[in-house]
């Protein structure tokens, strides 16, 4: 059998250089010396008889041949990792790694608790959590970098035929006010009252912001007329701003369970308006599904109930 003109280590090095943008940073990330990295790439180029990087640039830039090898090499490495994980599974959850993805709010407030439950039952399984935008997490699932993910938005159009999307649970979005706000003394507030508030909001491209705008529009409320005091990219920063009396905000109920319990923000009900979004589980049906993934789905995810139902996971355990 003819020997391959490259090794897995060389593919890992190529991938690291492309990711880090330089030989030095790639060497640091792989805990090897820069000369060792350079020598491996020189040997690889000689074996393939092609140049993999543009010479003369400060940044390590792949040639067309380098990009081609990176694309196929990434698939080879992913398949090797999949094979190792399948073999680990033969030990019946006595090892291996579970990689879970989540969009921002879900990853911050829901997943740590569910992962904690899983780790109590299967302490030998290492669990990694990746939290990014819905778009980035969807691509990570599609590429096999994440086993499954829970997202609060829609899968990108180009991945809808690739990923399996399953409705999971409803997540209610609450209008929160500072405890000192006059509206906190009222019952339900009227739709017109929303135009009198000053809002702390996520940026217009965020999934939650889009859901809020859509649902409010369906109820005849024009969110473009809202007075936006400031836009922040962190739910924690938004909650702190509300607690400090800077304005009102819409956030997931799962993000304010502690604040409601301590009574430091007010959940204002809007008359005849409830804002909800659907959380979804996404997987790539064409990728290997580990026992850890199946177990997490069947034993842990089924325990979830929405905070707006005033229940806890403990009620079901």
UniProtKB/Swiss-Prot annotation:
Residues 23-42 bind DNA. Keywords: Chloroplast, DNA-binding, Plastid, Transcription, Transcription regulation. PROSITE patterns: HTH_LYSR. One of its GO terms (cellular component) is chloroplast. It holds the Pfam family LysR_substrate. Residues 6-63 form the HTH lysR-type domain. It is found in: Plastid, Chloroplast. Its main location: plastid. GO terms for molecular function: DNA-binding transcription factor activity; transcription cis-regulatory region binding. Belongs to the LysR transcriptional regulatory family. Trans-acting transcriptional regulator of RuBisCO genes (rbcL and rbcS) expression. This is Probable RuBisCO transcriptional regulator. It comes from Porphyra purpurea (Red seaweed). The gene is rbcR.
């Amino acid at each position: 059998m003819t020997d391959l003109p490259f090794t897995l280590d060389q593919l890992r090095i190529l991938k690291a250089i492309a990711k880090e943008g330089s030989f030095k940073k790639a060497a640091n990330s792989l805990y090897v010396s820069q000369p060792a990295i350079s020598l491996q790439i020189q040997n690889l180029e000689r074996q393939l008889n092609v140049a993999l990087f543009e010479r003369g640039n400060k940044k390590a830039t792949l040639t067309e041949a380098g990009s081609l090898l990176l694309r196929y090499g990434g698939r080879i490495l992913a398949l090797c990792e999949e094979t190792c994980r399948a073999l680990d599974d033969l030990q019946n959850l006595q090892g291996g790694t579970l990689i879970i993805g989540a969009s921002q709010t879900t990853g911050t407030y829901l997943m740590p608790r569910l992962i904690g439950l899983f780790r109590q039952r299967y302490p030998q399984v290492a669990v990694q959590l990746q939290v990014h935008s819905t778009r980035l997490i969807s691509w990570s699932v599609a590429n096999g970098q994440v086993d499954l993910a829970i997202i609060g938005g829609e899968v990108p159009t180009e991945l809808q035929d690739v990923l399996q999307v399953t409705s999971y649970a409803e997540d209610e979005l609450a209008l929160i006010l500072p405890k000192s706000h006059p509206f906190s003394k009222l019952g339900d507030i009227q739709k017109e009252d929303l135009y009198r508030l000053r809002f702390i909001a996520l940026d217009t491209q965020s999934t939650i912001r889009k859901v809020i705008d859509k649902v409010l529009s369906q109820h005849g409320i024009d969110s473009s007329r809202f007075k936006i005091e400031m836009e922040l990219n962190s739910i924690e920063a938004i909650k702190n701003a509300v607690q400090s009396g800077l304005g009102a905000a819409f956030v997931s109920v799962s993000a304010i369970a502690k604040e409601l319990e301590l009574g430091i923000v007010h959940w204002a009900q809007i008359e005849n308006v409830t804002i909800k979004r659907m959380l979804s589980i996404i997987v790539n049906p064409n990728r290997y599904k580990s026992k850890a993934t199946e177990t997490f789905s069947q034993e842990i995810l089924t325990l979830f109930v929405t905070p707006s139902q005033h229940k806890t996971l403990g009620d079901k355990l």
